[in-house]
Amino acid sequence: MQAASESDRLERLEHAVEQLQKRNAELEAEVRDLKQEKTAAVADPKFNTKIIHDGKTYVEKAVSQPEKPPLFVQQRGSELKLVLGGFIQVNAEGGDAFAFNGNFGQTAIKDRFRLRRARINLTGDFAEQFDFKMEGDFANSDGLNNNRLAFEATDIWANWHQFPAAQIKVGQYKAPFGLEQLTPDTVIYTIERSLPTGAITPERQIGVELWGQPFTAIWPDQKDLLTYYAGIFNGNGRNVSVNDNNEFMYVGRLELQPFNGPIFGQKSFLKLGADALWSRDASGTNISTSGNLLVNADGSLSPFNLPSADERAAWSVDAWFEFGRFDLIGEYLQEHVEGRTVNGVAPTFSNFMTDGFYVTGAYYLIPQKLQAVVQWQYLNPGQKGNDGLYSILGGLNYYIRGNDLKLMVNYIHTWSDFRNANPDVGQDQFDEVLGRFQLMF
């Protein structure tokens, strides 16, 4: 028994010695690695140059530069979440560039590469049931020269979301009118929005709105069934510090999603929407803030800056159906613009009604990678006899990494009714090719 005990003890001692030797070897290896790292750091320091006098002449010597500590960023306030993001869109535009938008003849655009959007944004949430967004665009016109770009605010708003069915949003953002206008720039299927959308929708405005989803609390599984928006805005565009008069723009939208679920095993949904707008505007107000509406003498279009005061009302309806790889989107918009007398000054333009529509179809040829797009659009500006513009579009979208990295190409053919009826003013059909690279971060 004693011999066995001595044997066990010796075996344990030998095992302990082996473990110590192994650990010692590991420590020696770590020390060697640390020495090598230190040597490499000394061998490749960061230097600045400095001119010094050595008693005879001035010479340039290298002076070691201490490494800076890593950058540390922390929010000043008590936000629960703070997110920095942005995106870049670069266009190549050739042929009759932007002819679909009425840019031909006296408003023609030359072939170009274009920094379409370069935006950076900051979003956040507070524990007190507020969220916010601040976004600016480095690719906007600076208002001094249309050929230059400068930084300009796009979205600056705060939203109180204590009650999902009744939220309050204040600041500058897109007024709730028009499906295509409200669809983010980074996810629409065509490179540019349609002419009817640009001509009629109010785009970004400064104001306040009440909005919400009434079924969020009582029917959570169907919270998207109904969404409503009701807003009051200055009505004279974004980044303007004054209202054009003592009147306001009133905008409302209803969205209904009666179906969201699989059809024959394919992801599917149906969304319906309707909008309404009413506004009284002063002379000089641009009523086509994101597109062209005014018909020029040669049938081309330009932004509509009111020559005198007006009263206008607009409405639209839209639908979006998705079935597996296929999407079908359509929208119809209409606006009535009537001159009004203010302080004894009679209107200097004739009343008119403008309307238009677009229908867009999209299909993934390769799921989530390659998408084919077609679109038919029409705008009747309603200011001259037979002044409508038609366009048909065909395109491809290649999703390198979803919408984060995307390539797009569109071919657009446009017809001008006005120029067809008045051939002396120039050609009535136009062709253009648009390309886009998009990066989101």
Which residue stretches match the model-derived regions?
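A periodicity- and composition-biased signal for non-globular, repetitive helical segments
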Residues: H15-E18, A29, L122-D125, A199, ...
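Outer membrane beta-barrel
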Residues: P69-W278, F321, M353-G382, D387-I392, ...
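Outer-membrane beta-barrel pore domains
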Residues: T107, L144-N146, W157-H161, Q172, ...
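Acidic-residue sensor for enzyme active/binding pockets
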Residues: E6, E14, E28-E30, E135, ...
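N-terminal periplasmic/intermembrane-space "pro-region" immediately following the signal or transit peptide
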Residues: Q2-Q89, D96-N101, P220-L225, F441
